[in-house]
Swiss-Prot record:
UniProt pathway: Glycan biosynthesis; glycogen biosynthesis
CDD domains per UniProt: GT5_Glycogen_synthase_DULL1-like
Entry protein name: Glycogen synthase
EC number: 2.4.1.21
Broad EC category: transferase
Species of provenance: Koribacter versatilis (strain Ellin345)
Claim: Manganese is one of the keywords in the record: no
Keyword terms of this UniProt record: Glycogen biosynthesis, Glycosyltransferase, Transferase
GO terms for MF: alpha-1,4-glucan glucosyltransferase (ADP-glucose donor) activity; alpha-1,4-glucan glucosyltransferase (UDP-glucose donor) activity
One GO biological process term: glycogen biosynthetic process
Record-listed ADP-alpha-D-glucose binding positions: K15
Lineage: Bacteria, Pseudomonadati, Acidobacteriota, Terriglobia, Terriglobales
Amino acid sequence: MHIAFAASECVPFSKTGGLADVVGAVPRALAALGHKVSVYTPLYRNTKLENPKTAVRSITVPFDDQYRFCSIVDGGMIDGVQFYFVDYPAYFDRDALYGTPIGDYHDNAERFALFSRAVIEGSKILGVPDIFHCHDWQSALIPVLLRTLYAEDPAFDHAKIVFTIHNMGYQGLFPGEILPLLMLPWDLFTLTKMEFYGKVNFLKGALVYADFVTTVSRRYALEIQTAEYGFGLEGVLRGRSGTVAGILNGVDYSEWSPETDRFIAAKFSADSLAAKAQDKADLLREFGLPETKLPVVGIVSRFAAQKGFDLIQQVGDRLAREEAIFVVLGSGDKTYEDLMRRLSKQYPNRFAVRVAYDNALAHKIEAGSDMFLMPSRYEPCGLNQIYSLRYGTVPIVRATGGLDDTIENWDPITNRGTGFKFVEYSGEDMLDTVRKALELFKDKTAWQKLMRNGMARDFSWNTAAKEYVRVYEKAKQVRAPMPV
């Protein structure tokens, strides 16, 4: 099967979030299963290519009664995956991928409409796939275009479209007047197609026109069909619930494993847990703290309400009075950056905070912490809780999205489970759950059993790739009904 991925970012070439990790990993896992895989992504200013070659010299894209000419660069084959880069410097030769600290780029609709057109036109020359696998709003026009403007093009008669939602909170909303600028017909601006409260919604268009929709955990696939998590599109998703599936993200264990991690002070495994104490001591030194027998609770996160920082705001001073040390790495909303700085200043022996992102330090926190706190309001999949399992760092999570799918609550009677979960989104419920974990930590036999349970779990990309293949096979048997 030939699968073509289309996404706005992809490791190792560009990254702002988890989308890039998925688009960097799933194609490789599919190629390892014997499939032909290509990836289309923009050529940004900071994209580094070793031996770039022009694959398609000139693609014509109509815009506002004019034509834009872009090219596609051949990025070569990596681990069995062919990489192509859409090159249009006026749109992609910029300091950042989507915007400045002040806000999004004003022409993001045009930028990613051009990208979507270029992928379709480029595939006519480079090879139309059996499956177009598109990701998030930046490539959401591909399903729309293929089922409208390209519906009569025989080149795409047999191509199917799978669309993956990584986060419903980002939908690609633009003024209705953008449609003629993008040379898209006004009849798309209806309630059953792309209109959304007076705006054009790119994500909605993909949900309407794709043959199959996936998201990044089973629980999140159900949650987004409810008003609480659907961000206004729950009705669209419920209307096609038979072609919506959740597939858990995997983890690259060559990068995230305590047995091989190049960033940590001491390597360890489930059979040699004693060495983890050296990583704990190294982590405390990194933050200028003395060695201690108290449990260390790690947090690596964007500082935002979605990530549960409003709960930490509610009970932060009470957390600081617990017999634990909280080690925090991240950045984000100024309100929560200020909160973290205050807690670290007021309770220097209980809260250690680094307002930044540092990949090496993130590894040290995973390896050196005893627990890892992720109290998210919603979490499509989440990766840090999966990393934590492999490092024997016990997750404390809210039971939502991928956090609920990946963490099994500890049962002291059966000694089963991999972490601690709370259901109610409240500071009190979170605090109670942290206290349960701190209490169990005193029982070293039970705690080591809990650690080893988590370390035995396998969330490799190979498992996810096989599930995607099953979705592709289903997509080949269906076709999204045309909206009226």
